[in-house]
Amino acid sequence: MALLFLLLVLGFSSIGSQAFVTSHYWGTFSPFFPVPSEIDPAIPSGCQITFVQGMMRHGSRNPNAAKLKQYKALIERLQKSVSNYGKRVKFLQTYDLAFDADQLTPFGERETFDSGRSFYKRYQALADHNEPFIRTMGEKRVVESVSLWKRGYYHDMDDKPPTMVPTNVIPKTEGFNNTLHHGTCTAFETDYAFRGKEAQKPWLAKFTRPITTRLNEMLPGADLTTTDTVHLMQLCPMNTAINNIRSEFCDLFTAEEWMDNEYSETLAKYYSWSYGNPLGPTQGVGFTNELIARLTRQPVVDHTSTNTTLTGDPATFPLDKKIYVDFTRGNTMLAVYSALGLYKNVRPLSKTRRTPAVDAGGFQTSWLIPFAARMYVEKMKCGGQDEEMVRVLVNNRVIPLSGCGADKLGMCTLERFVESMGFARSGGHWDQCFL
């Protein structure tokens, strides 16, 4: 399996009495891994799944074109200005970037295939008798991820259909309403979306300062900046994923520094896409209202980012399915988590002191939106209960629902869950998008 392979590639170190896995602190560049759960993620004894909504992020990818340009400029500058390389950084003298911008890596392809296979195995009782309805936003690597996921989904099915179910692609076009891709909330796109970067700055300056000093001592003449340091850290996961061996970039940084770097990204995400931003959760309201419609088998009621042409047509938005799977990118997933009220009890994250994931209710970027991230919204019928129950898992971690009287398994009745979605049902501040 992809996860086991990467762990073997990366190896382990220790911090305190616990094993430290570097790849669990790569933020959005982390490969998928099952996140620790205080509640057993297995389907509860005596319960039968009657509905599942999956939301998936694409697998591991190469750097995007803009980031690749920045990496190339940094490496070219280093190789021109540095003549004396220490042993630990000697590899930089001949290092060559071998990336294919924006494309999935071979590891990411396997990761996504495994995601589909895992989904089928978990929901086999439902999947063997019900076709999934699958949608995606229209970005190349995301669309490719759907095909890989479907291959994994059907891989272990004894009675395979003659053809895989089609994929409904929602165009990533400016001005085109799309619940799987942000872009239509003007105030967010032009202002609020950048607040995470501002919130990140104090911590970024604090944790990178000693690292930058150390690297400049190792690379005399490099004159590295904070941004350069972060880019060198990012080249660790990027090179590891494409080469299938642990990158030498990874060994330039300590376990504490990896945790600090992860927290920096967590701050940026929290203050852009989640509760730290007045319009962050708003970007997930449209999908949340679609989810309510699917759970209740009632028409969509929404005046935000839904596309009424699509949601009004049973061919593009059926209400009679038991398995729905949507593919998107990490930021949209995070906005959806927040619109759903997940992690709602997280206190505002400190901009100057690192808050560990366990103290932040699990709010850590690599726990939320790693490559091949997945959210499952399950509806189930449990013995002795008249009404169906709803619960949510994010990367194998049960996220206890809030505001609906959740039981010890983190579940709420369907009726109370829908009632608790007041933020989304009332428009989620969408009116502020155009002030």
Question: Which residues fall in each region the model found?
Answer:
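Fungal secretory targeting signals
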Residues: 1-19
